Amino acid sequence: MADHWNKLTRPSSIKVVGGKEPCVMELVIEPLESGFALTLGNALRRVMMSSLRGFAVYGIEIEGASHELTALSGVREDVADLVLNLSMLRVKLLNSNQRVLRLVARGPGEVTAASIVDSADHVVLNKDLHICTLGKDVDFCMKIYVNSGKGYVPATEYRAASRSGGASEVGSGFIATNALYSPVKKVALKIESSRIGQFTDYDRLMLTVETDGSVAPDDAVAVAAKILQDQLQSFISFDEVEETRKSVDKEEGVLPYDHNLLRKVDELELSVRSHNCLKNDNITYIGDLVQRTESDMLRTPNFGRKSLNEINEVLASMNLHLGMKVPNWPPESIENLSKQYSED
């Protein structure tokens, strides 16, 4: 059964190309089996646009305003305009999932998101956002309610929650707003042909991702991939490594492990930097290495995306990959087993 996935080509290279804006990035993934670029690209795009958690304004509170159609003295815009403007406010909360921000300003002049009172608990990502325009000597103060969530939540839900007492820290003048939580603004796919040796019937997937700045584009892709992995795991009714071991035993005979798992990483043709990173992280055998995730590896000092691509390519050549589960690892007498495999 393991041949169903072991015989497929896995991506050996993931290149990250930064754009002119820090919130825009292109990822180039290759090689992929024919048709897989569209399959994986669409799945990643849908998850990124719908299921990643972010932060959004879900309500405001202004003294003297009881509903969206209230006209404010000395303010050019009415409350409905303020609500519309604040729906585009992008904030990142650092130490909590819910917070009340305060905006204080005095006219005359334009009021932007830069007037939101600074705090160590949040970061305003678009401080140049226009909020309202004040007349001369007009004092303006507003509470802005921000929380975390996913997708889109209409104002009616928060309005109902505030009336029933289900929304915490909400005052009597609370005005609910529509909340759009997705930190990903745009995902574009481009698919080209890729080559392995003389064969050109492989896919290259290019993902252009734009976020609001609360999450890096490459992290958004990684989180989306993890969500898909977790959701699809429920469909797997067998042990991946056990099936791989059975396949190896069938082909090679008696030994209980894929011989590659018992090889030492020193045998791999890696750069000096990659070798040193593995050594410093006490990774001795390939069996140790494959159980690490990409996130684990990227947290290793001096280990970057280039080293990660190099290791992915080497493992793919052995039909292995990072993030595998190897039960009962390490085996007893691993040194003897390793020698036995090397002798075979």
Curated annotation (Swiss-Prot):
Q: Where is region (Alpha C-terminal domain (alpha-CTD)) located?
A: 254-344
Annotated segments matching region Alpha N-terminal domain (alpha-NTD): 1-239
Which Enzyme Commission number(s) are listed? 2.7.7.6
Tell me the lineage of the source organism: Bacteria, Pseudomonadati, Pseudomonadota, Alphaproteobacteria, Rickettsiales
Q: Write out the entry's keywords from A to Z.
A: DNA-directed RNA polymerase, Nucleotidyltransferase, Transcription, Transferase
Pfam families given for it? RNA_pol_A_bac, RNA_pol_A_CTD, RNA_pol_L
CDD domains in alphabetical order = RNAP_alpha_NTD (cd06928)
Subunit text: Homodimer. The RNAP catalytic core consists of 2 alpha, 1 beta, 1 beta' and 1 omega subunit. When a sigma factor is associated with the core the holoenzyme is formed, which can initiate transcription.
Q: Which SMART domains match?
A: RPOLD
Extent of the signal sequence:
none
* GO annotations of cellular component type: cytoplasm; DNA-directed RNA polymerase complex
Annotated GO biological process:
DNA-templated transcription
Domain note = The N-terminal domain is essential for RNAP assembly and basal transcription, whereas the C-terminal domain is involved in interaction with transcriptional regulators and with upstream promoter elements.
Cited function:
DNA-dependent RNA polymerase catalyzes the transcription of DNA into RNA using the four ribonucleoside triphosphates as substrates.
Source species: Anaplasma phagocytophilum (strain HZ)
User: What reaction does this enzyme carry out catalytically?
Assistant: RNA(n) + a ribonucleoside 5'-triphosphate = RNA(n+1) + diphosphate
Gene Ontology molecular function: DNA binding; DNA-directed RNA polymerase activity; protein dimerization activity
Which named protein is this?
DNA-directed RNA polymerase subunit alpha
Record family assignment: Belongs to the RNA polymerase alpha chain family.
- NCBIfam families listed in its UniProt record: PRK05182.1-2, PRK05182.2-5, rpoA
